[in-house]
Amino acid sequence: MGELRPGSGVHYPGSVGELRSWFGTDEDCLDYLDWLRWPEGFVCPRCGHLGGWAVADGGYKCAGCGARTSVTAGTLFDRRRTPLTVWFEACWSFASGKDGMSALSLQRSLEIGSYATAWAMLHRLRSVLVRPGRDRLTGTVEVEETYIGGEEPGLRGGRAKGKKVLVGVAVEVTEPRGFGRARMQILTDASAGTLHPFITAHVEPGARVITDGWTGYQGLDKLGYTHEPRSQRAARARGEDPGGLLPGVHRIASLAKRWLLGTHQGSVQEAHLQSYLDEFVFRFNRRRSRSRGMVFYRLLELAVAHEPVRYRQLVANPQPKRVPPRPPPGGGHPPSLDRPRAARPWRTS
């Protein structure tokens, strides 16, 4: 959005009441997505030409190549069946909940007839939470690995056994005990061939990187980092708790596991774990935001910047494995949430 500084009540709704007043019809929602996607005017997704003509179905015809496109084509909302008014309610619920929400909670709150629909909506939202080209971590950064799904003392990296998933954790640390942004990513093992790419993908060269003494971290200085390894063995020899060497990543890992257990009862399949980690990081990095409306705004910005994810990409089976036995009454897809129409303040700012 360039130099735009979004404001509550102008560029995004400041309350759920304002949300429902602004987005009473799918046409209102489409206009908002149009404004978010092309704030300086229509840009053809096919040829990149600036400018076109609005067509009767609410889309555009490119003035350059003549291609027709809809506002939602190539976005999270492409080929949707659920009304956009319901999607916007789901986005608000997703953004406004401090700890997120389960598919069952979304199904009940919006009276979505199909649990599978609510489940897929949440997973599609999770699929857009990583901004393309996002900035890497800077300053002082702690890096460590952890296991999601259980731990076995004494096992590490490729030597680990059991149904656990190895996850890389990186977090900016500030004095005296503060945290900045975080990153989490599933790792295949804890070798240098895996850890080095994880760090270069998420940490800006020149940063001070603090790790334990694991051999997989050796050589970071050659990649442009100031590497500070901290030996667990030396800490034990000094009578110190080795867990205190990297308090930042241990805190983040603990919060993530607690969040998975509390919000999703720990029932996260490995195939979807990265999406849940992306959601946790999205929420953690916005923990100081005072406006849920701003988080809603950022979420929709991401939604129009990402390619759509199809249902068949989300599941290996025709439906999620855990389907509640008593869905709310109604059809497979909710009706549009009809509301009084309001002005479109984002167009008048």
Feature-to-residue mapping (PLM):
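Residue-level recognition of single "structural anchor" positions
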Residues: 1-349
